[in-house]
Amino acid sequence: MGFYSMPRYFQNMPQVGKPLKKADAANEEQLKKIEEEIHQLIKEAQEAGKADADVNKRGELTALQRIEKLVEPGSWRPLNTLFNPQGNKNGSVAIVKGLGRVNGKWCVVVASDNKKLAGAWVPGQAECLLRASDTAKTLHVPLVYVLNCSGVKFDEQEKVYPNRRGGGTPFFRNAELNQLGIPVIVGIYGTNPAGGGYHSISPTVIIAHEKANMAVGGAGIMGGMNPKGHVDLEYANEIADMVDRTGKTEPPGAVDIHYTETGFMREVYASEEGVLEGIKKYVGMLPKYDPEFFRVDDPKAPAFPADDLYSMVPLNDKRAYDIYNVIARLFDNSELHEYKKGYGPEMVTGLAKVNGLLVGVVANVQGLLMNYPEYKAAGSVGIGGKLYRQGLVKMNEFVTLCARDRLPIVWIQDTTGIDVGNDAEKAELLGLGQSLIYSIQTSHIPQFEITLRKGTAAAHYVLGGPQGNDTNAFSIGTAATEIAVMNGETAATAMYSRRLAKDRKAGKDLQPTIDKMNNLIQAFYTKSRPKVCAELGLVDEIVDMNKIRGYVEAFTEAAYQNPESICPFHQMILPRAIREFETFVKK
């Protein structure tokens, strides 16, 4: 500790933010009420299915109990807890997923929820699994499965088994991860036929419980391989006889086959806990840099408490706030060395530290921007949260420099969109927005996006949004999050303005159209709120305001755990570009 490169660039960077003058009790109450609603939905989803006690009576641990024993205390960062895009009755896609440290290393962990249909594949699960492999690929960290999967839920097989991003796609992704040198480690429990079998066999290392099995098909499938096309009494009796027989024999693919004969299973354990210890053992064999190798400063907590965010981030999106106060509560010692401060004033870009590790930060500024943007008439007033020419140019430069210097990026998004109109078109905003997407796509660095409040229009994409599948490791929202292509009033006006004009000209009653407009406005509001954002996967988790820093830490430490490429500190350009602008341009 204490021996760091280029301390005059990276230590004692400018501090930002101010102490909270007065708590906003009403705002805090509103935000915490929404957080509590999310907590309750999570509780209901986790408790759905068999009771924990009933699972334990069978000699099994639940998915959450297995994760608790696998992951280091305090390191679990849940992801996609409420993800349920097709409305499964149990409120989830029957897996538990997140980032956590296993034997000192950050891993993406996915556990079959054995409380629900014995961990079956259900609608939406494949997409959630693909997001897990996306996160592992982007962060270059191991993917760990705690598998207990009974295969496809047959009565909804058309929503689970086929399709381009369907039940088989995660097996191709596991192959891709192996080819990229990203290990996939699985611990298997219980019966895993068909989709469960391929889920078992596709990882790098297979560790099994002594009662586990994995197979192309289970006993039930074997019994129905020569169907008549219908079920009659004779066939029903044959099925019943088969069940009686197989109940007394081992299902296909048990340990005596895949450990003793094929050798597919690397190790077998007699206890539930033994399998988890086996996973830890193999994770322990994997490469990892000591974080001290990449540190530029001693780890420090932010200078201000995270609880201040409940007063500083208004739930009412018509109210502005100081983004520097947010940054000050997320990064080490509330330090930020800003890139091109004053240019593109609608955006903050700069270098910050997370537990002593460098990250790039990009965030929207709120409030009025006087005499801006420059391409409009003199005396124009820009609106914070909107993107203009200078801000887009600055972000393109910043992302490109972060990519060159191999620095992960944290995006803090609260945007109403990109400026519109002929002035904006002449200022090339359409092209500059796509330029930023190009810069992000070519960066090949891990990025993490927080939708602090609003994610709107194309700005939601270009500000490091989750649409960047190859760069966005994951994204989170808050109790204040609202994601929609535009606000409801704008949508209603765009959709019904001509109808209003036409009806008024014809002397018709406008009230029916007014009612439709108000219904659309309400629908936009309802469908853009945190609950729906979580269920549809518009963000990967709704996170309490005072827990955002924990996700920033997990992302940053994971990104530096085993990076694909490195830029030596003394060869970086971004910190020097910041210094040059401050010294020779700004003055």
Swiss-Prot record:
Role of this protein: Decarboxylase subunit of the primary sodium pump glutaconyl-CoA decarboxylase (GCD).
- Cite the EC number: 7.2.4.5
Question: Top-down, what is the taxonomic lineage of the species of origin?
Answer: Bacteria, Bacillati, Bacillota, Negativicutes, Acidaminococcales
InterPro entries from the UniProt entry: AcCoA_carboxyl_beta, ClpP/crotonase-like_dom_sf, COA_CT_C, COA_CT_N, MCCB/AccD1-like
- In Swiss-Prot or TrEMBL terms, this protein is called Glutaconyl-CoA decarboxylase subunit alpha
Which Pfam families did the record assign? Carboxyl_trans
Which organism encodes this protein? Answer: Acidaminococcus fermentans (strain ATCC 25085 / DSM 20731 / CCUG 9996 / CIP 106432 / VR4)
* Gene from which the chain derives: gcdA
* Keyword vocabulary terms for this entry: Biotin, Decarboxylase, Ion transport, Lyase, Sodium, Sodium transport, Translocase, Transport
* Region named Carboxyltransferase: 31-558
Keyword Transport in annotation: yes
User: Entry's PANTHER family?
Assistant: ACETYL, PROPIONYL, PYRUVATE, AND GLUTACONYL CARBOXYLASE-RELATED, METHYLCROTONOYL-COA CARBOXYLASE BETA CHAIN, MITOCHONDRIAL
Q: Which GO terms describe its cellular component?
A: methylcrotonoyl-CoA carboxylase complex
